Amino acid sequence: MAYQIDQKMIHDQEPMAEIMPNVITAMSSLLQRVSETNDDLSRPFREHKRISAFNAVTKPSISIRSYMERIFKYADCSDSCYIVAYIYLDRFIQKQPLLPIDSSNVHRLIITSVLVSAKFMDDLCYNNAFYAKVGGITTEEMNLLELDFLFGIGFQLNVTISTYNDYCSSLQREMVMRTMYSPLLEPAFLVRSFHKNLLKNLYDEDHRNSQVTSAV
């Protein structure tokens, strides 16, 4: 099946292990900006705001970055799952414009997107009860959120190689922007490693495609 081929190729194109912490930081930074912007935009219309299962009763005290680092530490899913989860979140935003990502739902959307991504991408993954514990919610809530999320993205789980690479490039730009303001990161190594890995994987993909074409 086509989606199985895409899964295999995406796993082959995982970000290099040494830069994954920076990928997590970049994703956190993007989601932080989105949630803060939507908080400001929705404040005048708070009384008419649509409520969903993703909205927490109170804003979680843990930061988005710390929350994602916790998931990264304990979920033990493949690195590509986080890129795919990011893609799923974007699909959710596009398909559910009345449920923008904000500080009340971003944490639950993150844990759910990673769960759904891990189940689709990885051969082995933890169950909902484990993810619920990592995410600080009940298993019943995790089950409900998973179902709501799947319906929210229209069950569009497959990710093409080109889409995956586009989002990798987006995160790469975010990582580069962060290095401009943080002397603790190493921009030259970061960009070179990420770009080299993408080029290698794109070459491998072209090589596979040529083999498939010659075999037909």
Curated annotation (Swiss-Prot):
Molecular function (Gene Ontology), one example: protein kinase binding
Gene Ontology BP terms: cell division
Cell division found in the keyword field: yes
Tissue specificity of this protein: Expressed in roots, stems and flowers. Expressed in the shoot apex, leaf primordia and young leaves.
PANTHER family from the UniProt entry: CYCLIN-U4-2, PTHR15615
Homology family: Belongs to the cyclin family. Cyclin U/P subfamily.
Protein name stated in the entry: Cyclin-U4-2
Organism of derivation: Arabidopsis thaliana
Gene from which this protein is expressed: CYCU4-2
